[in-house]
Amino acid sequence: MNLQTMIRTLQDYWSEQDCIMLQSYDVEKGAGTMSPYTFLKAIGPEPWKAGYVEPSRRPADGRYGENPNRLFQHHQFQVVMKPSPDNIQELYLGSLEKLGINPLEHDIRFVEDNWENPSLGCAGLGWEVWLDGMEITQFTYFQQVGGLECFPVTSEITYGVERLASYIQDKENVFDLEWTEGISYRDIFFQAEFENSKYAFETSNTDMLLTLFDTYEREAARQMQEGLVFPAYDYVLKCSHTFNLLDARGVVSVTERAQYIGRIRNLARRIAKTFYESREKLGFPLVKEEGGKRHE
């Protein structure tokens, strides 16, 4: 099964579980969790079921395309369900079966790994899912997002697209993966991986990045004063990515690192609170009324 077919299979499966299929969010981020489709939608009582592929940029993990499984940019297939179904684990195992992985024939383990994202003020109970000794998925029940307690609880399933495809295709090097017939992962991503690694470690203008962080932070705060959650959150994402670029260059000290993370977290918490209040003023329109109908 090539990677393109694998993604389509996951999309079809989770669509059958009433998840809407979204496109990736167009601002740089380090993980699918940071998309507003997860971060903001996990806030408040409104139900939400969605899936999407999210390119995830982690500058410090770049290896110029020379490492078989560490990348500047990888992909995650993200599934979020609120409230979390009682049978979410069974649903997940069912998705593996659709990919040709019979849970009865493989060693599948849920290894406790509680999750935290200090930049966004998020935390939850979590497990890594190991398939025959390889981690392929992160499974999380959100307890807190943006400093707010989650009720109802949102479940998040994050498939590592490249890792899962490597297992299915029995490839040791991610660049050897077949994306679709006749086209490899290397054909599509190798040049970008090399150049982005060189940028992250060698050529980025750190003075400019320091200025950009401050500029993005001010703009996020300014948009919050206007009550504009989504524009403000876009700039928080830009702050996060800019910080990651600075961190990759090694120009941020241990003390400064904590300070930068704190600045991002403070903005994220303000945004979470404002988003909750804005939905509350609307009467939480996606909450079902008695009889199963939604507010329109």
Curated annotation (Swiss-Prot):
* Reactions catalysed according to its record: tRNA(Gly) + glycine + ATP = glycyl-tRNA(Gly) + AMP + diphosphate
Query: Which locations, inside or outside the cell, does it occupy?
Result: Cytoplasm
The record's section on CDD domains has: GlyRS_alpha_core
**Chief site of localization:** cytoplasm
Give the domain of life.
Bacteria
Report TM segments.
none
The UniProt entry, under Pfam families, shows: tRNA-synt_2e
One GO location term (cellular component): cytosol
Keywords (alphabetical) are:
Aminoacyl-tRNA synthetase, ATP-binding, Cytoplasm, Ligase, Nucleotide-binding, Protein biosynthesis
Asked whether the keyword Ion transport is assigned, the reply is no
Q: Name one GO molecular function term.
A: ATP binding
Q: Which GO biological process entries does UniProt record here?
A: glycyl-tRNA aminoacylation
InterPro entries, from UniProt?
Answer: aa-tRNA-synth_II/BPL/LPL, Gly-tRNA-synth_heterodimer, Gly-tRNA_ligase_asu
Q: Does the keyword Ligase apply?
A: yes
Reported EC number(s) for this entry are 6.1.1.14
What quaternary structure, including any partners, is listed in this protein's UniProt entry?
A: Tetramer of two alpha and two beta subunits.
**So what family is this one in?**
Belongs to the class-II aminoacyl-tRNA synthetase family.
Q: What is this protein called?
A: Glycine--tRNA ligase alpha subunit
Species, as recorded = Listeria innocua serovar 6a (strain ATCC BAA-680 / CLIP 11262)
